[in-house]
């Protein structure tokens, strides 16, 4: 397999071309300051980037758009972006047609924040022709955890649908800067549109709270999460965890079974070989408990951004999560 590198980016953000505060150039400057390698600007039913990807210094800027209607939001990524006439879709058939057109143009499709109380997906989506699903939108909150649970059921049932995260950034709120929160890291052959989108579709990725937050990599020989490996009795998969935070919990799953669990202490890194007992998949995640100041700050954010969800019981949140490594 060709050499691959880890590259970080944000799949979901808005500029002043639709309802964001900053111009595309200003948004790009903010992303460069975050240390991102690639971004996809996804204005509502508009293309703010142009026909092709380009580089602003070392930052890859990929064309995108959020196909937006009252029944659901869907991101489309890539240089073959369809033209939009400004009409907001109303019917399921319009989403199906747009997904088909996007795919025929070589684009990548992702369903956005499907369980969001304000802008959720209100149509059938178990069999919708999408490459990815945005399981983590904005800061981690209740509807994201619901989506993660849904996604877990999908992959347990054998559906290979890649998970990704997007900040859905529009502007700063006081001192709260949510750009690149979360951040999606992809394992790609190069920092090009073709290789970034291919890695997103395959699930060669993990999602984490920010560019500087924890990192999780599952590997077997030259394969990582998103790749397919052959089951061998007695086999072990390597887990490499970096930038760990105290009092969080790291778990590795072989299908629904927890095969490794560790309460993080003072260590900042961890390297473990973990035995795999059955075919299916392996994935890893880090979770934390909402307590004290963190809980109070979370409640304030929910009251502002997701008031319909603020009273839903919630005390465990995902901090970092991988896509599955498929074991066949």
Locate predicted features.
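C-terminal functional module detector
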Residues: 1-6, 172-328
């Amino acid at each position: 397999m060709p050499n691959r590198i880890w590259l970080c980016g944000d799949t979901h953000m808005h500029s002043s071309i639709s309802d964001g505060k900053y111009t595309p150039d200003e948004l790009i400057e903010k992303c460069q300051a975050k240390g991102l390698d690639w971004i996809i600007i996804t204005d509502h039913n508009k293309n703010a980037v142009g026909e092709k990807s380009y580089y602003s210094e070392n930052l890859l800027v990929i064309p995108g758009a959020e196909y937006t209607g009252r029944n659901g939001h869907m991101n489309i990524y890539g240089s073959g972006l369809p033209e939009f006439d400004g009409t907001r879709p109303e019917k399921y058939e319009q989403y199906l047609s747009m997904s088909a057109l996007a795919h025929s143009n070589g684009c990548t499709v992702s369903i956005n924040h499907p369980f969001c109380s304000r802008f959720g997906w209100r149509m059938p989506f178990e069999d919708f022709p999408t490459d990815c699903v945005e399981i983590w939108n904005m800061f981690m909150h209740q509807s994201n955890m619901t989506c993660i649970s849904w996604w877990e059921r999908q992959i347990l049932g054998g559906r290979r649908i890649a998970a990704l995260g997007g900040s859905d950034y529009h502007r700063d709120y006081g001192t709260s800067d949510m750009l690149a929160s979360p951040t999606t890291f992809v394992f790609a052959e190069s920092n090009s549109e073709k290789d970034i989108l291919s890695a997103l579709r395959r699930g060669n990725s993990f999602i984490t709270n920010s560019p500087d937050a924890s990192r999780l990599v599952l590997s077997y020989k030259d394969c990582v999460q998103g790749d397919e490996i052959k089951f061998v009795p007695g086999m072990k998969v390597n887990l490499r965890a970096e930038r760990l935070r105290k009092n969080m919990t790291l778990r590795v799953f072989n299908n629904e079974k927890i095969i490794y669990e560790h309460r993080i202490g003072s260590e900042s890194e961890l390297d473990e070989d973990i035995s795999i007992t059955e075919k299916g998949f392996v994935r890893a995640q880090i979770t934390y408990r909402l307590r004290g100041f963190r809980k109070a700050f979370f409640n304030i954010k929910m009251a502002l951004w997701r008031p319909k969800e603020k009273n839903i019981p919630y005390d465990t949140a995902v901090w970092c999560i991988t896509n599955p490594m498929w074991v066949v």
